[in-house]
Amino acid sequence: MHFTQREQDKLMLVIAADLARRRQQRGLKLNYPEAVAIISFELLEGARDGKTVAELMSYGKQILNEDDVMEGVADMLTEMEIEATFPDGTKLITVHHPIV
């Protein structure tokens, strides 16, 4: 089986998000890459589920809060952009201040 670079990137994101969720479930606060992985994964899955870009932009702010992440992570993550595949094509999702 051969995966394109884009497919490999998505698989790595799934693995990173899964590891981050496991750490979160153990009560650990998430670092920057873990927070980005979880939010990105949830946005990609939302697109796959048929949510609109506007819905995902709003949802992106509800996935994590400051209590979920290490000190300073929310301040570092001021904007996220992720390209997701929707039923009508690929679109860019931008979430401003995803961790509140």
Swiss-Prot record:
Coiled-coil residues: none
CDD domains: Urease_gamma
Single GO cellular component term: cytoplasm
Entry GO MF terms: nickel cation binding; urease activity
Domain of life of the source: Bacteria
Pathway(s) per entry: Nitrogen metabolism; urea degradation; CO(2) and NH(3) from urea (urease route): step 1/1
InterPro entries (UniProt xref): Urease_gamma, Urease_gamma/gamma-beta_su, Urease_gamma_sf, Urease_subunit
EC number: 3.5.1.5
Gene3D superfamilies reported in the protein's UniProt record: Urease, gamma-like subunit (3.30.280.10)
Recorded effect of pH on activity: Optimum pH is 7.0 in phosphate buffer.
One Pfam family recorded for the sequence: Urease_gamma
Gene Ontology biological process terms in this record: urea catabolic process
Thermal dependence, as annotated: Optimum temperature is 55 degrees Celsius.
Similarity comment text for this entry: Belongs to the urease gamma subunit family.
Subunit structure: Heterotrimer of UreA (gamma), UreB (beta) and UreC (alpha) subunits. Three heterotrimers associate to form the active enzyme.
Protein name: Urease subunit gamma
